[in-house]
Amino acid sequence: MRTYWTYILASKPRGTLYIGVTNGLIFRVEQHRAGKGSGFTRKYAVRLLVWNEEFASARDAIQREKKLKRYTRAWKINLIERTNPHWVDLYPALPGVAPVPVLVPRGNLDPRPKAEDDS
């Protein structure tokens, strides 16, 4: 069964909002983050996934997107804050998103220059 999503991206808490619909939420958010999504998201640096809703049909997801776009900005902010009051980026918690690797430096971490060998 195919799944569809309506989603809201933000540039920052209570910042610029973008509403979209997709059948591949992870891929689409990654496109937006890489500046390959839409011209709008690229121009306004809208990259935080702050809200999403899952649907079984494309028609239902598109209807929801159209409805959300008609609502006022205040209504949209209220929608986001009811489920995500701190405007946390939801993308890293999506099932299937690879965790960001923790880089462990190798070698000497001492910033002081090495003493020359006087032998």
State where each predicted segment sits:
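Catalytic/regulatory signature loops of cyclic-dinucleotide turnover enzymes
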Residues: 69
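GIY-YIG nuclease catalytic motif and its immediate N-terminal context
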Residues: 1-54, 59-66, 83-85, 89-113, ...
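A short, polar/charged loop-to-alpha-helix boundary motif
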Residues: 74-80
